[in-house]
Structures are given as structure tokens and as C-alpha cells.
């Protein structure tokens, strides 16, 4: 019985679609080793241990984040989800430097143009006090919005779809940029895989 239960759902690390040094110098291999290899691995390990024997066992990370009460299970599930979306949205050689297709049309509709969106997203991430995330999300009506989430929270908690996330916890950038959060954010725009972001709509 124990073996069967353990097969229901275990949370695992996302496979990076690039080599650990491929995003350098924007995100160094050292940062990937710590941020992905240690921080995210810890959240994954914690979540697997915490949900065992609870009503959340066997639920997807998205399901947990949507309904779990504030506390350790929610915090770790949120960070597993956030970091999975984060690491999978990058590519060392983007085919395009801004969105195309339906994502581009939605940005045009809801922000006026790409530069306005970029400025608003950067401002949200820059101005978030302490640790947290800035997200481009799609609300229940299909409108694109920028959401600031504290700590490990995610727009799923508000019934939205997360499309693009910027991590402003210091562990995301301190090895490469020290206290220069703004420089880090400016560089992230150069490695976004817009096709991945669009496919999340």
C-alpha cells in the first residue's frame, strides 16, 4: 500500500531546456547551480514531505496553490510552481525579441504596445518591496494584467493564468548583480522564449 500511495504524485524538478551555463552572463551557471539546483530542489523536497498523509497528497501543484491555506504547504507549492514557470520561460537564443501572434495582439489590446507593457512589468518588479514575484497573467475574462505577488504566491490564487514571471527574491540575482535588481530585470528581457509564454495562454 505504501508503494502504491507513493506513486500517486511526487513532485520533481523541471528539466532545464538549456545547459546550466547557457544563459550566462545574464544568469550565470553559479546562479543556476544555487537557484535551480539548491533553492528549487529544497522546495521540491519540502513539498513532497509536507503533503504526505494530507488531503493535498495526489494533487497537482496548481491545485495546491489555488486552495491551500497560508502556511508551509502553500509556500513550498507556490515556489515549486513559480520556479518551474520561471526556468522554463528562458532560452539562450530567442527566435524573436518580443511576442508575436495572439500574445502580441493581447499585449497591444491591454497595454497599448510592447514597450508600455515592458515598462509596467519592469516597474512592478522593481517596486515590489522585499521578496516576491511580478507576473504577467491572464484574468478570467482573458485580459492581460500585471500582478505583484509577495513571497511564494502566484496569480493562480486569484483565479488567473500565470504567463511570465520575474523572481525578485535576492537569491535570483545577488550572485550576478548584487543589489542591482534593475540591471538584472533589464537583462531578463533578452532571454525570454516568447513562444513558451504564448503557449501558457
Language-model-derived ranges and their functions:
Residues 8-201:
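Feature for soluble, non-membrane regions of globular proteins
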Residues 1-8:
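Short, Lys/Arg-enriched N-terminal segments with co-localized hydrophobic residues
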